[in-house]
């Protein structure tokens, strides 16, 4: 299906020069002189290489038909993640680098959305929020209330994020997976 370049959004799967790419970032630029154009940062689905392309906003680009399926994450090893299709119970693997830094948010039994192009899995969408345990947090410095201060904390998956000063080691929190930020304490 062909779409105008100005309709490209992060998460789209495009076909360009005979290869399929996952769109990571887009930016529309309107120079003072000349026509507007869009810069697109994208990742080659097969090789994982990142590339940047620039198109005029009126150009047409081939968008791949994507089939989204609900799948359950089973486990990961040194190089692959294993998932199970929730409808057919069929298992498949994907390379660990598909998710990049956010792979630490995957938990056994987590339900995720996997995008398929021509029957092959190409990308994973994590739930927007996940529950994580704080395993390491710096102590609070008393009297430091003049500015809104956040302190670094280490989560059970090894990731470090900034959390409010009242959080302590061992507490369970909710983390936003899109920007790796603290949302709130877990109530439950």
From Swiss-Prot:
Species this chain originates from: Paramagnetospirillum magneticum (strain ATCC 700264 / AMB-1) (Magnetospirillum magneticum)
Pathway listed: Protein biosynthesis; polypeptide chain elongation
UniProt keyword annotations, A-Z: Cytoplasm, Elongation factor, Protein biosynthesis
Protein name as annotated: Elongation factor P
Family, per entry: Belongs to the elongation factor P family.
Domain of life: Bacteria
Pfam families: EFP (PF01132), EFP_N (PF08207), Elong-fact-P_C (PF09285)
GO CC terms of this entry: cytoplasm
Primary location: cytoplasm
Localisation: Cytoplasm
Xref: HAMAP family: EF_P
MF terms in GO: translation elongation factor activity
InterPro entries listed in its UniProt record: Elong-fact-P_C (IPR015365), NA-bd_OB-fold (IPR012340), Rib_uL2_dom2 (IPR014722), Transl_elong_fac_P/YeiP (IPR020599), Transl_elong_KOW-like (IPR013185), Transl_elong_P/YeiP_cen (IPR001059), Transl_elong_P/YeiP_CS (IPR013852), Transl_elongation_fac_P (IPR011768)
CDD domains attached to this UniProt entry: S1_EF-P_repeat_1 (cd04470), S1_EF-P_repeat_2 (cd05794)
Function: Involved in peptide bond synthesis. Stimulates efficient translation and peptide-bond synthesis on native or reconstituted 70S ribosomes in vitro. Probably functions indirectly by altering the affinity of the ribosome for aminoacyl-tRNA, thus increasing their reactivity as acceptors for peptidyl transferase.
PANTHER family (alphabetical): ELONGATION FACTOR P, TRANSLATION ELONGATION FACTOR KOW-LIKE DOMAIN-CONTAINING PROTEIN
GO biological process: peptide biosynthetic process
């Amino acid at each position: 299906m062909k779409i105008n370049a100005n309709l490209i959004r992060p998460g789209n799967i495009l076909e360009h020069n005979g290869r399929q790419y996952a769109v990571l970032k887009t930016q529309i630029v309107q120079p003072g002189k000349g026509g507007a154009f869009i810069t697109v940062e994208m990742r080659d689905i097969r090789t994982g290489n990142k590339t940047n392309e620039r198109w005029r906003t009126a150009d047409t680009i081939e968008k791949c038909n994507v089939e989204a399926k609900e799948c359950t994450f089973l486990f990961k090893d040194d190089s692959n993640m294993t998932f199970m299709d929730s409808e057919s119970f069929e298992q498949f693997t994907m390379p660990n680098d598909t998710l990049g830094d956010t792979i630490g948010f995957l938990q056994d039994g987590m339900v995720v959305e996997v995008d398929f192009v021509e029957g092959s899995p190409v990308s994973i969408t994590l739930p927007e929020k996940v529950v994580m345990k704080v395993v390491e947090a710096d102590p609070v410095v008393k009297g430091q209330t003049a500015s809104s201060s956040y302190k670094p904390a280490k989560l059970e998956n090894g990731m470090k994020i900034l959390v409010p000063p009242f959080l302590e080691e061992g507490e369970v929190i909710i983390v936003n997976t899109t920007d790796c930020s603290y949302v709130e304490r877990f109530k439950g």
